[in-house]
């Protein structure tokens, strides 16, 4: 597998320019760029600056993060989401960035949606977004979020949706923490049902050992520092033939307060150690 860094991991004290500098220094293969950080970068840099960096570097862009709350939008929400999505498509094309991560909707009211309502809406929306993305040559990586407030939580549910969409440019994100957050990865076998070519992105992260009903994204940890069965998950992916990105994505306030270079260095070293076990 190849190493990747998601901008979220050091975002409170960092920026895209710093992430690029240190990811290159510590020999990451890929970076996942956050759209908000890209927009901030473009206030003081140009796209040509960014394209020139990637042209000269071994570091390459992999997935833009993320288009969120795609389900059950009203007209105003849909318009706002589409504006960001089209921006992401344009940026992806210019940067030769192959994927955009898309995320289901979060809200307490999502708990009241039926399985069929979520399925039907997700299929419809992903097809519409796929139609928009196709001319730009970018693929959509649909990410289930394990927290009960999100409407698509499990790999089984996400894969059923993506399978029904049946587009070459729509696949899934395997995020270790999100799958653990759903049911402690007891459904790991569900990943076996997803064809290799439909696994677009792998987010590697770990978790504190606390009850699921209090677990939140702030409890993410560096790979190998927590209780997720990463060795088994990675072996499963390797057995399927997966050789692409293992991208460290963490939303831990403690890491956000650390020195940016230290976070990026540790992310590389710990990810590399886990994926080569």
What annotation goes with each model-predicted range?
Residues 1-4, 9-27, 96, 152-174, ...:
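Histidine-acidic metal/acid-base catalytic patches
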Residues 9-11, 35-37, 67-70, 104-108, ...:
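Active-site-proximal loop/turn and secondary-structure-junction residues that shape catalytic pockets
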Residues 15-17, 55-56, 73-171:
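Active-site acidic/histidine proton-transfer and metal-coordination neighborhood
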Residues 22, 26-42, 65-70:
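N-terminal substrate-binding region of glycoside hydrolase catalytic domains
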Residues 32, 63, 101, 141, ...:
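Conserved beta-strand positions in the central sheet of alpha/beta enzyme cores
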Residues 32-54, 106-110:
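Glycine-rich, proline-tolerant flexible connector loops at the mouths of alpha/beta enzymes
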Residues 41-45, 49, 76-84, 113-124, ...:
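Alpha-helix N-cap and loop-to-helix initiation/capping positions
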Residues 45-57, 125-132, 190, 194, ...:
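Catalytic-core regions built around general acid/base machinery
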């Amino acid at each position: 597998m190849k190493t990747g860094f998601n901008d979220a991991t050091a975002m409170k004290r960092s920026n895209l320019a710093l992430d690029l500098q240190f990811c290159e220094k510590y020999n990451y293969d890929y970076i996942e760029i956050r759209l908000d950080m890209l927009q901030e970068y473009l206030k003081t840099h140009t796209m040509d600056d960014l394209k020139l960096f990637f042209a000269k570097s071994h570091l390459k862009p992999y997935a833009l993060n993320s288009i969120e709350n795609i389900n059950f939008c009203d007209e105003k929400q849909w318009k706002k989401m589409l504006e960001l999505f089209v921006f992401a498509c344009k940026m992806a094309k210019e940067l030769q960035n192959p994927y955009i991560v898309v995320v289901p909707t979060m809200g307490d009211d999502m708990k009241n949606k039926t399985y069929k309502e979520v399925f039907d809406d997700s299929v419809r929306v992903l097809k519409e977004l796929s139609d928009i993305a196709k001319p730009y040559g970018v693929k959509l990586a649909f990410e289930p979020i394990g927290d009960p407030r999100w409407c698509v939580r499990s790999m089984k549910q996400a894969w059923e949706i993506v399978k029904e969409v049946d587009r070459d440019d729509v696949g899934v994100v395997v995020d270790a923490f999100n799958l653990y957050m759903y049911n402690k990865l007891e459904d790991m076998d569900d990943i076996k049902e997803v064809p290799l070519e439909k696994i677009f992105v792998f987010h590697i992260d770990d978790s504190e050992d606390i009850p699921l009903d209090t677990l939140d994204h702030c409890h993410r940890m560096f790979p190998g520092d927590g209780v997720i069965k990463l060795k088994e998950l990675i072996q499963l992916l390797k057995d399927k033939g997966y050789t692409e990105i293992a991208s460290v994505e963490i939303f831990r306030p403690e890491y956000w307060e650390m020195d940016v270079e230290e976070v990026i260095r540790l992310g590389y070293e710990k990810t590399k150690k886990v994926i080569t076990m």
